[in-house]
UniProtKB/Swiss-Prot annotation:
It catalyses: gamma-L-glutamyl-L-cysteine + glycine + ATP = glutathione + ADP + phosphate + H(+). The modification Phosphoserine is found at residue 356. The gene is gsa1. Pathway: Sulfur metabolism; glutathione biosynthesis; glutathione from L-cysteine and L-glutamate: step 2/2. GO terms for cellular component: cytosol; glutathione synthase complex. Belongs to the eukaryotic GSH synthase family. This is Glutathione synthetase large chain.
Length: 498
């Protein structure tokens, strides 16, 4: 983009145009919890003024492997023994993982007593695989940062950021127009909603089949998608964008419920269906879509945990199921990177394509590789990042801070962390706009490839599997964490380089 050729006056004009477009198209956080005098307050989501330049081959590699990743994590979610083998031990030292694992066990016990017509075998995954473009003397390509299986965010507003940069190009705010490339047309909104809509259709077909077998007349209702959210949610526009797309394109109604109010849902024990009552009517729930629930603090009470179990046992399709949530833990990512683990689930070209994206990772246990990881953590910490099982940003420990953190905790707790080698991300320059004026930074980019999959956990049949667009986050090179909602990074779009 040759951003060094822009004058301060041009950057100021570009910043004003980008900021106005962002507000006009919902690229904002809402600050309902701090509104004053009854006013709603919105702040612009941090954005880049220019698209992020990503090597063509690296981007194609990341996009091409997404369907294999979708299938991989669906299979992991179905594999109780694999999850038990690698996760049960860390539940002793991680309260959140312990609670999730206990819910999973209780769900398995409850399912064993359900009648066939009360059991839901279908599951929905809305996934995001995050990468940085790694470069060394002999290699340039994508290395995976993490794989997310719950509450993947910014698929809604990322489409608007792509449109924002297109507007800047078409309206003359760039010195040189962007080159149109079909590969970077962002289908994040339609892609995610296609997956959710397919799950709704699968639910309808499944329920219709049940009623037909039992000679019960269908009630002809249109089941809904239920977004489970947190109170005072800031990222509303990202979520609402998906709701509007579901309604306008797929004619699927969505409703929202605070995780603290899950006990208001209605569970019909005879049919095992889930219902939501509003001031207007009562809706049958086809899909429960969690946009919260990935952190311990998200659950305000034991009742919220109990209701997640109740929902898990109903006929509604869950996104994600508890087993899919567990499959997305950092420990599973680390285990997959070890030799032979991946062969349990994939083979051939898919196996090789997925394996090529793995970064170097270590456990911190008493296995030979774990002992090697412990040695590296203390002797060469500057080459690594230490990751707990938690999602949401702001939880990692970097470089020289790693030995101090490990020294403060009992050694038996180290196994609940993984050690990951730094990805040598390709740097560039960009302007980040999150206040009144854009600021120029040396930056690195993280691309997140979105995917959706609907599958049958009893038969392993895949009903739908697709790559569903992308997001791009850009952060100052000196910043370790990469979360937009936590204030570390900004949203961008992608322009490809040869």
């Amino acid at each position: 983009m040759e951003i060094e050729k822009y004058t301060p006056e041009q950057i100021e004009e570009l910043g004003k145009g980008a900021r106005d477009f962002a507000f006009a198209h919902g690229v904002v956080f809402t600050e309902l919890s701090v509104s004053k005098e009854g006013r709603n307050i919105a702040t612009q989501i941090p954005i880049t003024l220019f698209p992020s330049v990503i090597p063509h081959g690296a981007f194609v590699e990341a996009v091409s492997v997404q369907k294999a990743y979708n299938k991989l994590y669906a299979k992991i979610a179905n594999d109780y023994e694999f999850l038990r083998l690698h996760l049960q031990s860390i539940t002793k030292y991680d309260e959140f993982m312990n609670k999730l694992w206990n819910l999973y066990q209780k769900h398995r016990e409850a399912v064993a007593h359900l009648k066939e017509n009360q059991f839901q075998p279908l599951s929905l995954g809305v996934f995001r695989s995050d990468y940085m473009v790694h470069q060394d003397d002999s290699f340039i390509g994508c290395k995976q940062v993490e794989f997310n299986t719950i509450s993947v965010s910014f698929g809604g507003v990322s489409k608007a950021v792509s449109n924002l940069h297109a507007y800047c190009s078409q309206s003359g705010l760039y010195r040189k127009p962007l080159t149109t490339n079909y590969l970077t047309v962002n289908t994040s909104v339609s892609g995610i909603c296609t997956g959710i809509s397919n799950a709704v259709d699968a639910y309808r077909d499944y329920v219709k089949n049940i009623t037909s077998k039992m000679n019960i007349a269908s009630d002809n209702t249109k089941p809904i998608v239920l977004f489970v959210v947190k109170g005072g949610e800031r990222n509303i526009t990202d979520q609402r964008t998906l709701e509007y797309e579901l309604l306008n394109r797929f004619h699927v109604i969505s409703k929202r419920i605070d995780i603290a109010e899950l006990n208001s849902l209605i569970h019909d024990k005879s049919s095992n269906k889930l219902y939501m009552k509003t001031s207007f009517t009562t809706y049958e729930v086809a899909v429960v879509y969690y946009r919260v629930g990935y952190a311990l603090d998200d659950y305000p009470s034991q009742e919220a945990w109990d209701m997640r179990l109740t929902i898990e046992n109903t006929l509604a399709i869950k996104c994600p199921s508890i087993s899919t949530h567990l499959a997305g833990s950092k420990k599973i990512q680390q285990v997959l990177a070890e030799s032979n683990a991946l062969e349990r689930f994939l083979e051939g070209d898919e196996l090789q394509a997925v394996r090529s994206t793995f970064a170097d990772m270590y456990p911190l246990d008493d296995t030979p590789r774990g002992k090697e990881g412990i040695k590296l953590a203390f002797e060469k910490p500057e080459d690594f990042v230490l990751k707990p099982q938690r999602e949401g940003g702001g939880n990692n420990t970097y470089g020289k801070d790693i030995p101090g953190l490990l020294s403060k905790m009992p050694q038996e707790e180290w196994d609940s962390y993984i050690l990951m080698r730094y990805i040598n991300a390709v740097p560039s320059q960009n302007y980040i706009l999150k206040g009144e004026r854009p600021e120029k930074f040396d930056v690195v980019d993280e691309i997140g490839i979105l995917g959706t999959i609907v599958w049958n956990i009893k038969t392993d049949e895949v009903v739908q599997n697709g790559q569903s667009g992308f997001i791009c986050r850009t952060k100052p090179k000196k910043t370790n964490e990469g979360g937009v909602a936590t204030g570390y990074a900004s949203l961008s779009s992608i322009e490809l380089s040869e």
